[in-house]
Swiss-Prot record:
GO terms for biological process: phosphatidylethanolamine biosynthetic process. Pathway: Phospholipid metabolism; phosphatidylethanolamine biosynthesis; phosphatidylethanolamine from CDP-diacylglycerol: step 2/2. Keywords: Cell membrane, Decarboxylase, Lipid biosynthesis, Lipid metabolism, Lyase, Membrane, Phospholipid biosynthesis, Phospholipid metabolism, Pyruvate, Zymogen. It is an enzyme of class 4 (lyase). NCBIfam families: PS_decarb. This is Phosphatidylserine decarboxylase proenzyme. Its main location: membrane. It comes from Legionella pneumophila (strain Lens). InterPro entries: PS_Dcarbxylase (IPR003817), PSD-B (IPR033177), PSD_type1_pro (IPR033178). One of its GO terms (molecular function) is phosphatidylserine decarboxylase activity.
């Protein structure tokens, strides 16, 4: 724990938003020499497997961000026939029941559904006995997010906040981390009731985006988007792309009807998992 504190303490002191803005600027630079340098060194540092990428040649990307949100060859991530599939490549931080409206962040640390979603008590009440899974995307992972189940898009809320790192050490130290950081809460209807996918921002995450909106503009104000009427393509099928991170972060998946979700017993905190793998069955 002491080592985690030492790693985390500087984050309270550095200008996280300024550093993130600067990183975002360089990640969009299209100068061939600079972007190729950034991409080449990133691949080397994080041992990125470019054979899985739809475009294998690193020099073919216009900028670092285009490389970072690269598409994969479909055959590299076949979709299982499970009722609920994993929406990302990543690692399970925590998974299980929402207990009296509280989600487990790390050992001994909790945060509430209402805090995470920045919503009223009536909406949070729907998830008070639900199920959740927190999925951490490391820098080397594929950074597009897909649908875990067929769903109808209802609304989206951009919630401004801090930009702490979401690496495991930070989650063990910073209280209510996912309810403090900038995030995008996306609300869906499914055949088993309400579902929310929360895309959590972090230090040097240049942008969070969705397939229907594009990059969501960073702001100091909470903003809600209602898709109940004006949006035509509201039904998004299982496995379809729904969003992306420009640099890595975390997805928190919430189901309101906890009695209907039975997580795969092999999924434990710390488990690695890939897009399309089985996550849960509907009972």
């Amino acid at each position: 724990m002491f080592r985690d504190v030492l790693k985390t303490l500087p984050q309270y002191l550095i200008p996280k938003h300024g550093i993130t803005a600067l990183a975002g600027y360089f990640a969009d630079v299209k100068n061939p020499r600079l972007k190729n340098f950034l991409i080449r060194n990133f691949i080397r540092k994080f041992d990125v497997d470019m054979s899985e990428a739809l475009i294998e040649d690193p020099k073919s990307y216009d900028c670092f961000n285009d490389f970072f949100i690269r598409h994969l060859k479909p055959e590299c991530r076949p979709l299982s026939q499970s009722d609920v599939i994993c929406p990302v490549d990543g690692c399970i931080s925590e998974i299980g029941k929402i207990e009296r409206g509280q989600l487990l962040q790390a050992k001994g640390k909790y945060y509430s559904v209402q805090e995470l979603l920045a919503c009223d008590g009536q909406l949070a009440e729907q998830f008070v006995q639900g199920q959740f899974a927190t999925l951490y995307l490391s820098p080397k992972d594929y950074h597009r997010v897909h649908m875990p189940i067929d769903a109808e898009l209802v609304s989206m809320t951009y919630i401004p906040g801090a930009l702490f790192s979401v690496q495991p050490a930070t989650t063990r130290v910073v209280p209510k981390l996912f309810a403090r950081n900038e995030r995008l809460a996306i609300f869906f209807k499914t055949k088993i009731g309400p579902m929310v996918m929360v895309m959590v921002g972090a230090t040097i995450v240049g942008a969070i985006g969705t397939s229907w909106h594009g990059d969501v503009k960073r702001s100091k104000k909470l903003e809600r988007f209602d898709y109940s009427e004006q949006f035509s393509d509201k039904i998004i099928s299982q496995g379809s792309e729904m969003g992306y991170f420009k640099l890595g972060s975390t997805v928190v998946l919430l189901f309101a009807n906890g009695e209907k979700i039975q997580w795969d017993k092999e999924l434990l905190a710390g488990s690695k998992i890939q897009l399309g793998k089985p996550m849960a069955i509907i009972t």
